[in-house]
Amino acid sequence: MNQLDALRQYTTVVADTGDFHQLAQFQPRDATTNPSLILKAVQKPEYAPLMRATVAQYKGRSLDEVMDRMLVRFGCEILNTIPGRVSTEVDARLSFNTSATVARAERLIELYQAEGVHIDRVLIKIASTWEGIEAARQLELRGIHTNLTLLFSFCQAVACGQAKVQLISPFVGRIYDWYKKQAGAQWDEAAMAGANDPGVRSVRAIYEHYKHFGIATEVMGASFRNTGQIVALAGCDLLTIAPELLAQLGASDAPLSRALDPEAARTLELDPVHYDEAGFRLALNEDAMGTEKLAEGIRAFAADTRKLEALMQQAAD
């Protein structure tokens, strides 16, 4: 049995791509997208017509509406290939605006429903700021399910659990990147691999907290740099994996066993944790890695959204 099939015994495998032509090869249940992945996709010849057609059909509409319609078209194409859910991201520039995030999420859902997609097949991706988490809380109360992304710090995960969001995406690779950069020449790749990887340790702590305290929010590890990180998180509720790493797992027959176990998590001695807004902001501020990577991630997604808008404007001319 290859590692990808072995992983499926313990974890729901999700494809992290906007390239829906690749999906059938790996048979994921769900798929995730973000502005960077969509930008990458529309620059490929096979996807450019989809963007041009969307821009032409809705010529004269606001740029943000045309953007949402294009994201939904990608999402619908993905849903034609997979049995589960697609995650579609709200504009990262709204990450500090609760009401605007709610409004944009509701529009995305309306657009999906107009295409005949059931609300339960869509997760709205929102950055894990305090404002984003509050928006997700409100959306969940309205039956719109959310995926809280750019999650690097334990306090973000706790707040998401309190808000009863559907799913969180704690990042592994970007945490690994930060600690490796900080260590510089002192970094020992072998010693910090697998279960010792700082990104893996972060997701494990979140998973154990959720399972120990019976928090229903799904944990989906994201942002992987190598298959060792994935193997070390076998048993996590879901893992969203880029096609290149899915292919590597499918080509490997190395042993893979469960690393995260909900029953084991329930036996741990853990203290309950709760955050109000002030406590959340202080805890995040105290976490230099979490603060820096959250800000960096929002900036990067915002920049790629602007690049997408520029391509759409070119297509409209």
Swiss-Prot record:
Active-site residues, Swiss-Prot/TrEMBL: K125 (schiff-base intermediate with substrate)
Location in the cell: Cytoplasm
Keyword Protease (UniProt): no
Pathway membership, UniProt: Carbohydrate degradation; pentose phosphate pathway; D-glyceraldehyde 3-phosphate and beta-D-fructose 6-phosphate from D-ribose 5-phosphate and D-xylulose 5-phosphate (non-oxidative stage): step 2/3
InterPro entries recorded: Aldolase_TIM, TAL/FSA, Transaldolase_1, Transaldolase_AS
Highest taxon of source: Bacteria
Protein's GO biological process: carbohydrate metabolic process; pentose-phosphate shunt, non-oxidative branch
Predominant location category: cytoplasm
Cellular component aspect of the GO annotation: cytoplasm
Pfam families to which the protein is assigned, alphabetical: TAL_FSA
Subunit note: Homodimer.
Protein's name in the database: Transaldolase
Record lineage: Bacteria, Pseudomonadati, Pseudomonadota, Betaproteobacteria, Burkholderiales
Name of the gene: tal
